[in-house]
Structure formats: structure tokens, C-alpha cells
Amino acid sequence: MSPVLEDVVELDKTAEQVVASMLAAEIAEKIFYTDERVGKVYPNLISPNAFDKKLVAIAVLGYPERVGVWSYTLLRQSRLSESSMEPYFREFARHEFGLVAIDPNFFDPDIEGDSFIYQLERVVADIAHDKKIGFIGFSLGGRILVEFLERSPLILGRAAGLVLIDPVLRNELKLGNIRRLLDNDTLLIASQDEGHSPGEIASVLLQIPRVSFPGLHGEMPNKAIEEIINFYEKRIP
């Protein structure tokens, strides 16, 4: 096994240990779907009774991370608490919000985004039409959400808001359908590190303001959680 692949395998194991801890603490549960493209079962992670809440937020992480952690870069630095998704599950439950974290890299790391879109569509289909949907995308997950929502205008009417955490976007973007969502109901988080961060570049590409935090790319989900909770609290009566 190559050193790079061995590294990712070990990081995957750490992510699985984080999930196991969350399951044992009963702050998260697994929900299983079948990927009809390959005939295999995969899990998503949900907060208890997530689909019964007035707001159901879908968290989309980056590449090649597995559900349970936001950043393998931080894991390599033994910064597990800053990378863990556990605070999100605790805070969303405390505020009576549902949270679903998809796991698009479950079978293999997916840099193209096909499994991201597939899993997003499955979760959205499971959310009742009287519920509002929140979208949270970090890194590649932010790009996936921008492109997914742009080509899914029927879903836009159900969106309570879009949170983009240091999203890594393409330079060429179509934004016609989501322009109103971007202007009125989008929270953009940007890292402040050396050079131009993904969030700073996204602010220019999307033509929307940003909320900046000092620190590295992988630190942003942990640093932004209070801002994100406040953002959704303002959008759900």
C-alpha cells in the first residue's frame, strides 16, 4: 500500500471512531440507503428525529473526508476536536434543528461529485414538503451545493438558507436560478490565511459579502458554528 493511500485509510478509521463515539452518546444515528448505481448500501449520519424538525439541514463535507470529521488536514495534526462534526450534532439538536451529514466518499473518494449529488437527491426526497431545508457546504461541498441548487429550481423554494464554508468554486459559474438565494439567504464563511482564501475568492465570484475568521481552511467549520446557528435561527419562526 502506498504511503498516501495508507494515510487516508488511517484517517478514515479515525473518522469512523468519531462516528462510533457519537452513536454511543446517542447524539447521532445512522440512516442507510442503497446506491442503486452499484447495488451497495451506504450510511448517512443524522441527528435523532432529524426529519421531524421544522428545519432539516444537510451538511456536505469536502474531499476526501469521510462523514464524522471536516478536515483530514487537522487530523494529521492531531487536532481531532477541531475537526469533529460532533459539535454540530449537539448544537443543532439543542436548537431543535435536524441535521443530516451525507457520506459521499464512503465507497471511494469522489472528486468529481457524482456521489455528492446522488446522496443529496436521496436525502432531499426524504424530507417532507412542509419542512424547510438548510444547506451547509464546506470546501468542495460548497461547490457541489452551488451547482446542485442552480440546476434544481424546484428545491430552491424549500431552502431556508445556504451556508458556504470556505467553498472551493469553479471560475465559470451559472448563478441565474440561485441569485436571489445568494443575495438574501446565504452565509459565506471565509478563512483569513496567507494569500487569497477560497472563501475570499468565492465572495468575488458570487458577488456576496463574507464573514471572515482567522485561521486555516480546515478550521473554519469549527470556528463558524455559532454564526451558522444564528443564521438559521433568524430564518425559522
Task: Tell what function each PLM region has.
Residues 2-52:
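N-terminal cap/lid segment of alpha/beta-hydrolase-fold proteins
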Residues 34-104:
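Short, surface-exposed "cap/lid" segments of acyl-processing enzymes
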Residues 54-57, 132-134, 161:
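Structural motif
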Residues 63-65, 106-107, 140, 168-170:
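Conserved beta-strand elements of beta-rich interaction domains across eukaryotes
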Residues 83-88, 94, 102-133:
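Alpha/beta-hydrolase active-site loop
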Residues 135-146:
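Gly/Ala-rich beta-loop-alpha elbow adjacent to hydrolase catalytic centers
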Residues 147-151:
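Active-site signature of alpha/beta-hydrolase-fold catalytic machinery across serine-
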Residues 153-237:
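The feature captures the conserved acid-bearing segment of alpha/beta-hydrolase catalytic domains
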